[in-house]
Amino acid sequence: VLRIPGVFTDNESGLLGLALHPNFNENKLFYIYYTTIIGGEVTNQVVRYRLTDNIELTDRKIILDGIPAGSQHDGGRIAFGQDGYLYIATGDSDNPSLAQDLTSLAGKILRITDDGEIPSDNPYVSNAYVNTNNIKQEIYSYGHRNPQGLAWDSQGNLWSTEHGPIAHDKINKIVKGGNYGWGLEGSSEFIEPYLSSGIETW
């Protein structure tokens, strides 16, 4: 049994996601998403480790930090896409307004390289507007409440499952730069879910 140091647990917080590097058989790298405490503040981060032949953890590297955390809605699913990039589902940390805030990593699906860099074709790559407004370049889509699943179909489309408020769970087809509506009031300028449970839960 591996023990991950520094994991903080509270309600929905804790050790939330695991992904193996696409070349895990050769490089033994894997990634975890977990809640921790840094400088007295609760936060979520993605960390990479290498697994030795003796089942020990080495070469720790923080791939992404500063993901808002709460006792609810921490997201936490991570997976490598067919394009080789790491996708990270984050919850709104029980603060719906953050899902629409492009300066926050909360309530988003993020996309980064295996080293934590920004892919050049992300929707908010570096330019004067992005830099001036402090938009997070890791963002791939936004307006999410608490996405809990990531999967790709045979055509390469990304799908996500998401917890809604009091049921209203949904399945979304994720598109680059898409706004999925959480945190908006009285607006229809967002992408409708592919499927919704309505007042029931699946």
Please describe what each predicted stretch is.
Residues 1-97, 149-164:
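Acidic, Gly/Ser/Thr-rich repeat motifs that build Ca2+-stabilized beta-propeller blades
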Residues 13-15, 23-25, 92-202:
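Beta-propeller domain segments
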